[in-house]
Structures are given as structure tokens and as C-alpha cells.
């Protein structure tokens, strides 16, 4: 294929011509979705929603809702299996938890009221009984009380899902009188503040362009932004730091945002202990030295120091301020400390002066204290394609975290990353990937009719077909983890406004199909109707997950699930790629951010001057205040059944490191449009450029974290993936075994400490052919464990 046929744009952003050839994409023409899976999804969507009363006109106004289980609420065919049957309730609960136990009385058919997770066609209610039709008109006179009750029932209309019910609304004469005037006044004030904020940001932009950036420094910045590879960017960033005098700041140890004296003392102690331990091991005198009473060996001193200092943000060494004063790097003392911690951890892992059990205990405690790193990809419709550049920059430097979470559009990118290997991703993250982005291809004559009739612009079934390629077919969260080792997390919000959100991953919903979770996380009201999560059963077929409840866009309530990640995976360092257009406009760091310092007054000034930064901060806080007032006073209406104030009032939109790619005005015009090759190439380039300044900070963090994970991996015995030992720690297993022996046997049957140490030093490998133990080897010499 020639370059003209490939259609390379005028500005290639550093990509070779092959990057614009879609035929070179892995699995380009492969359709992963099976017809049976798509049919199961269609049937799940057509099933009635069990969380809402039926509104199909088939239920009697005087009959209770679908949740009341009177004997007159079921047809004769459904009367054999009532929901109060313990077996039925247990079966439904198991299905909600991801199990596939058969439901008694179903016989491959849902019961009459839509309960259960089967994807077969449901039986709808047509009458209260065979002799009492639902819509039968009663002929005859009514009493005054009956007429009054009938008029009251007519006035009380059914509340649409997501709208405020009578229990949620306030009563009072002043509330009804002042609600709308107060809402209009505050709304007008908010609009005025928003316009003022835009003018303030424009003033700051002009100030920086014509005051802060001019002459030689502007030329150096242009050279830095023109790079497409990280090594080239580092060279340009060093040149800019040298010109601005930032290198002198690195040589000074003192800084208000960390304890420089403690860091200097710990660094020196680590270095001395490591050198002495290496000399002692080389001379082979560790045994004689350890026999001296009242003295500790250097390796023991090193172990104590490591356990004391390898913690999350120890004395402020991971404070983002330490990386916000220069374009590249941090204090020389901090960099030396990170290098020494890495060397000391390596020495503990490779030394022969510690037993394997001691090493295992050390790295287990250090891992719990240090925590993990997660990459969080926000929503943002077509703005989410900037995430490709962020992922590409991290991938090329081998800094892609194992824990990845995505919401809405970010969930689509996260699904691609979590289901592909590094080699596959390097071939996929190119501009030709735009040929697989066809979700918005329909003309206005098609989608407008759909929106008018269904209330949604896009079709859920069509999106399921396209999304299945990004998730490598009907792959579940557990299957993705087993294939790539990455932990995918997708935020989903229930269709009703009061149920809690869920974070789907291989722990909370292992059998949930990824493409269904991505669709649910992208189901913005008015754009895509709420969808049903699907799960994969033991036979490989799909069925509705969690009683067939419907879910919608996760960014409406939890765009960045930092708290859930911390609880489930011990994540305390987050890399957030924030591209939401309604949030990106308000992201402003008046005193600089990681890799992007304030240029004037040697980094001690304010962006746009003090007046510009103060005005920006005041307006932003005032906007937040009035939005909270409207929400707390319950004055905001709920268009499309959603409280839209939560788009701005969530707990956090950023992380330890926040990346916000540089957008342009045309992105807002194409917010619901598919990108072409040229546009996707620019978005990938801007995503990379926004990530390059953060890489040094991320690299220092992941160097230590991955070395700790390596220590845990090499010091644990061989464990088959998916077994109970991979979930429960070794200490917990030992306690369970001891407890079982003490309760079921005599005291002589309890394993002694010596026997336990001998057992922990044994290892075995199960051969694939015979399924027998191939051998047992002693680890007392500190040899590496078999993997």
C-alpha cells in the first residue's frame, strides 16, 4: 500500500506512514461477539425492569406494585412458584452474586413477574385472575367516598424513574411560594459567575502568553512541545530548566514541603548499612558477627531501616510540590534517596544472610505500607480519546500500572488496555485506530427519529456490537485479569437515584462481561438508555447479572472511584487522566503542577499574577457554594431523571498526579463525533505531551513499588493462579490450619514451629503431563523460588 493510499495527513505528529494503515492493526477484521451473546443481550433489554412498577398499562390501578406478593398478583401459571419460597430467594441471591445455580420451578423460563436471571422470554401479567380482567369497567353507581378516592387516584400519576417522589419533596407554603423565584435568581447568579470565570481565564492566558512567555524561553517551550518521544522531551526540558535557573533549586536540600534532615539521615544510614552488609557477605563472616551479644548485623540494621522508611509519602518525599518547581526532576537529595531505597531493597532480596521466610515477611509488610498505584481514566464523550496518548506515553516507558479504572468513555479505553498485552497495545495505539471508532456514524435523520421515540440518541444493541471488539469479545473481568495481569475497574450507577454505585472488577463481579459494563458506564441519560449488565455462566452463555437491574453512566456520581480502589486494592497513589469538558474548564493550578512550574519569579509567583489567581479561586469557590445550596434546599429539577449538580459536586476529580490534556475549541463541536486519522493523531500527541512532565514522578514511585512486588513474587511458594492460596495470605492459611488441628484433633496433632518452618521451606512443581510432583527442593540456601 502506497503512502497516498494510506492517506497520511499533512502533519503526522511523528507517526510513521504505517501508523495510518488500518490493515496493520491486530484483529482488525475479527468479530469477537457471538450471535448467541448478542441475542441474550437483546432479550435482557426487552425484559421488564423489576425495580420499577409496571407501566405497560396491563396492571390494575388498584393492584399493588410488582413488589407486593399477594396471591392475586400472579397468573395461574406463576402461582406454583412464589417469591417467598426460600429456595427461590436463595437462587436469585446466588445469581445476583455471580453464581449460576438453577432456580426452582423455572424450567428454563422466567416466572411471570420477571424475576430471575434467565434470558428466556418473560411471561407478562395480563389480568389479576382468569375471571377478573385488569381493565374491566365496573358498571353501577358509586358512593361519595368512592368518587373522591377515584379522583385522588387520577391526580396521583406514576412517577417516572429517577424523578422525585412525594417522599422526597418538601412541603410548606413558603417552600412552594419561593422555590422557583429563588431558583431563578440563584441560577442567574451562577450564569453570571460562569461568564466572569471565562473572562478571568482568558485574562490569565493572555497574561502568560505576552508577559511570562516571550523571547528565548518561548522558543525553548515550543521545542519541548514539538517532541513526540520522551527522551527528546527530557533533553528539551533540561534546556528550559537551565535557562530558567531551576537546576540551582535542585541542589538545595531545604524545602518546606518535606523533611530534608530526616531524608538526609535515612539516606546516609541506608547507604552505610548496605555497603557494610555487602562487605560482610563477600567475606563470609556473617555467622561469626551474628554471635556477638548485644550487637546487630548490618543486614538486620538495613531491614529495620527499610521497614521504617518505605511507606507511602514518607516524610513528604512524594509530595507533588517537590516535582512542581522544575520541568524535569526533583531535589537531588530526594532522587538520591529513591535510588538508595531501590538498591537497599534489591540487597535484601538477593542476600543470603536472611531466610526466605524473613524475606517474605519483610516484603509483605512493606507492600502493605507502601500501597499500589492506579491509572484512572475519566469520562468525557469523544474527549476520552485523549486517554490513548496518556496510555501510550506510559506504555513506552514501561510505567503502565496494573490497576486501571475507567468511567464512561474512559471505560472503553480501559477495556482495550486491560484486555490486550503490551505488544498488542503498541500496535493499536496509532492514528489508524480511528477506523474502529464508528459509534457516531449515523446521520441526523436516523438518530433524531430514535431519540424522539426512545429518548436516546444511540442504540444499545449497535453499541454492544462495536464495544465487543474493544473488550476482546465477551471477556469477563476475571478472564481479562488472567490474560494480561491487569486489574480492570469500571464504575456503574444504578438507574434508580438512591442505590449505591458499584465498581466492577475481578473481585466484586468476576463473571460480569466487560462490554456490558462499558455500555452501562457510558449510558448518559438522553444519549444511551440504561442497560443490563450481563454475566457469563459456566457453560459460556450469557445471562442478565444482578436480577436484570439496569445501570447507567458512572461519571454522573463517581467519576474517579479513589475510595473504592483504596479499600479493595490498597491504592494510595493515583494517576488521573481528566478530560471531562465540564471539569477540564475549571482545572487550574495557580502555583504550578507536577512538571509545569510557574515561570516567573523563579517559581514563587502566581499564574496570571496574584490578582488573576485570586479572582479565579474566588469565582470557582462561589460557584461550588451556590450549587451546594441549590442541591441541599432541593430546588434543582431532575431533567431526564438525573441530579446534574453531581457532575461538579463529587468528592474528587483529581489524584496524586492529575493529567489534563490540552484541548481546542473544535473538540466541543465534535464532542459526539468520530475522529478521523488526523484528529486522532493530534489527540494522541497532546495526550503524550501532557503525560511527559509527570513521568519522572511516576517513575520514582513505580520503581519502588515494582521492586516490592518482585520481592513478594520471588519469596512466595509456587501457587496455582485461581486457587485459595492466591486469595488468602500464607499467615492466614497457617492460622486456619492450626485452628482446625486444635479443634478436631489432640494436642500432639498440632504442627510445631520447627515442622512449620520445614514445611515453608519446601516447594514443588506440578508437571503438566502427569499431574504429579516433579520434585522437592530445600530453600535454606536462599536460591530463587520456582515460578
From Swiss-Prot:
It comes from Pyricularia oryzae (strain 70-15 / ATCC MYA-4617 / FGSC 8958) (Rice blast fungus). It is found in: Membrane. Residues 59-69 have a biased composition (Low complexity). Residues 47-69, 137-164, 745-787 are annotated as: Disordered. It is a single-pass membrane protein. PROSITE patterns: PNPLA. Residues 144-157 have a biased composition (Basic residues). This is Patatin-like phospholipase domain-containing protein MGG_12849. The keyword Disulfide bond does not apply. A motif (GXSXG) lies at residues 406-410. One of its GO terms (biological process) is lipid catabolic process. Gene3D superfamilies: Cytosolic phospholipase A2 catalytic domain. Keywords: Hydrolase, Lipid degradation, Lipid metabolism, Membrane, Transmembrane, Transmembrane helix. The chain crosses the membrane at residues 180-200. Residues 777-787 have a biased composition (Polar residues). Residues 746-759 have a biased composition (Acidic residues). Its main location: membrane.
